[in-house]
């Protein structure tokens, strides 16, 4: 377990560096195509550093805002707070900030950069449809993400992919409507080839970023399932919760493909999609979560 935590920390810094390099290369390609020269290169470096820094410090706030999460204040959330407090004592974690998303679909996610700066959000549908034992299993799963430092890795990836997609879109729009600047020194056959490569990179970069995000491994969810069960010492609780998630037909209205990876199960899949395990290898490779049936079976074998 401790080895996995250390591996996640190393993977986090590696992925941060890779996203930084990709953003930098993207802005340099943008600069080359528009011919801004040395000033543009300096701006590219500044933008890349700012985006990497912003991903690290503000990604949790962005994820919560995009999901329209609000603080879980009020007596109606007392059970929610009590369960998290008990699990945090058992796990040796500080209590994270608790949020709720007004949505009838049962789901939950954790975000933040470390256990001291973490947050957990659940939908109102989860609070209504899960009994105490099932809710405890889901919350233990989310707290395991915090303890294993999965939250930083996932949240940074979500924010960085969004930034890369935005940069690529802006670059292509400038190319389409404005073209290259006049007087650019990049001329001739070599310049044309480099321009072609830069243009292709603007198109391919968002796809590369998505592949990097999915490379953060679906095993992260399996590890959180097992870690959560070790925390509650009651596998049937999480098993029953996952079965309810599998059978529920609702999708989270405030979720998006950018934040899909954060949730305990894909918030955009219908019941039919959750049950479909016969997709092509390419479809399976781009899934953000392991099949719920597989996760349930692993827990039943414990």
Predicted ranges, named:
Residues 25-39:
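Short, hydrophobic transmembrane alpha-helix segments
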Residues 199-204:
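Select transmembrane alpha-helical segments in multipass membrane proteins
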């Amino acid at each position: 377990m401790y080895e996995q935590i250390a591996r996640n920390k190393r993977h986090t810094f590696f992925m941060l560096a890779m996203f930084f390099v990709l953003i930098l290369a993207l802005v340099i390609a943008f600069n080359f195509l528009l011919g801004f020269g040395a000033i543009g290169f300096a701006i590219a470096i500044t933008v890349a550093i700012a985006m990497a820094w912003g991903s690290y410090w503000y990604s949790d706030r962005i994820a919560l805002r995009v999901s329209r999460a609000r603080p879980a204040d009020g007596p109606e959330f007392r059970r929610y707070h009590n369960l998290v407090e008990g699990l945090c004592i058992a796990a040796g974690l500080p209590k994270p900030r608790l949020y709720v998303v007004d949505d009838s679909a049962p789901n939950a996610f954790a975000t933040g950069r470390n256990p001291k700066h973490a947050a957990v959000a659940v939908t109102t549908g989860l609070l209504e449809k899960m009994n105490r034992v099932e809710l405890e299993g889901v919350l233990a799963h989310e707290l395991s993400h915090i303890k294993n430092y999965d939250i930083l890795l996932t949240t940074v990836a979500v924010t960085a992919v969004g930034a890369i997609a935005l940069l690529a879109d802006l670059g292509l729009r400038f190319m389409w409507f404005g073209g290259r600047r006049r007087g650019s020194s990049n001329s001739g056959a070599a310049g044309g080839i480099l321009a072609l490569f830069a243009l292709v990179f603007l198109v391919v970069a968002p796809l590369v970023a998505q592949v990097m995000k999915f490379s953060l491994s679906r095993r992260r969810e399996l590890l959180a399932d097992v870690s959560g069960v070790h925390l509650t010492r009651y596998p049937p609780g999480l098993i029953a919760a996952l079965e309810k998630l599998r059978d529920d037909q609702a999708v989270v209205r405030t979720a998006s493909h950018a934040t899909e990876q954060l949730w305990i199960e894909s918030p955009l899949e219908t019941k039919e999609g959750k049950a479909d395990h016969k997709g092509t290898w390419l479809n399976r490779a781009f899934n953000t979560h392991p099949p719920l049936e597989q996760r349930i079976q692993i827990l039943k074998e414990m």
